[in-house]
Amino acid sequence: MIDYKSLGLSEEDLKVIYKWMDLGRKIDERLWLLNRAGKIPFVVSGQGQEATQIGMAYALEEGDITAPYYRDLAFVTYMGISAYDTFLSAFGKKDDVNSGGKQMPSHFSSRAKNILSQSSPVATQIPHAVGAALALKMDGKKKIATATVGEGSSNQGDFHEGLNFAGVHKLPFVCVIINNKYAISVPDSLQYAAEKLSDRALGYGIHGEQVDGNDPLAMYKAMKEARERAISDQGSTLIEAVTSRMTAHSSDDDDQYRTKEEREALKKADCNEKFKKELLSAGIIDDAWLAEIEAEHKDIINKATKAAEDAPYPSVEEAYAFVYEEGSLN
């Protein structure tokens, strides 16, 4: 484990980081159970990526703008999208904070939390976040904009256009490629020939680095340093977080393109289990503390699930709400 004290973190910080990683995982696991029970139609999972997500989130400051991608459940949970909010979205209920029950699950959005609305076409959030970074720079605010994408998105035109613009204008922008080595069923060997995707930063004139995405402290360090550069007028950063996708692409995907041995190896590399063992070994947490957290998160999720399931669906009359501006043509 990285020397957390050198990062300005305390033992309490590490416990908080683990708690959010665990809550994100538990919400994710409940979504899968609801899907398999036939209660919700679709799940796209972030299991195995919680270390990257919470490490990144923990380094951000209030007022920063984020453009997450669909696997960033733990990230948006930390940013303020509650378990109840997530289940409302999964059930397609009226009070879904993302879209009022209109958008697909895991298409996060919250003006109050500075979370830009997620689109289904991948990489489109990069130009959106770069535009937000431009606005922050023009307004003279010491804040940053971030976008996260999977490694498959790094081959999209929006990726190049956004990072090129960010580099030219030295914007306070950080792009995180969460490299879980699969774009649905396409392995990384068929996605790119470079040794590191972070090396692409050189062509944009920005800082680039590859980090261990299974280590929340490594991710925290990289994002904290990137943020400091950004607010100090040193331009943008491209971070490649190498991590794992422990599930199929989604609940509609057959994961047979990965061997049984490969899937088993992913479980052994579980970032949550790895970090938990490190904290136990260091004496920062113990079994009693873990049992308390387990009970707390189980209670949160059970209550949120029931409340969301019992919540009303949108009415037919609300079909066009938030689609067209209300009012007369005169």
Predicted segments with their positions:
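N-proximal short alpha-helices
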Residues: Y4, R25, D95-K102, I239, ...
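Cofactor-binding active-site loop characterized by glycine-rich and histidine/acidic residues
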Residues: K26-E29, L33-H169, P187-A193, S198, ...
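Generic preference for hydrophobic/aromatic residues in regular secondary structure cores
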Residues: M1, P105-H107, I206, Q210, ...
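A general secondary-structure junction signal
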Residues: Y70, A241-T243, V323
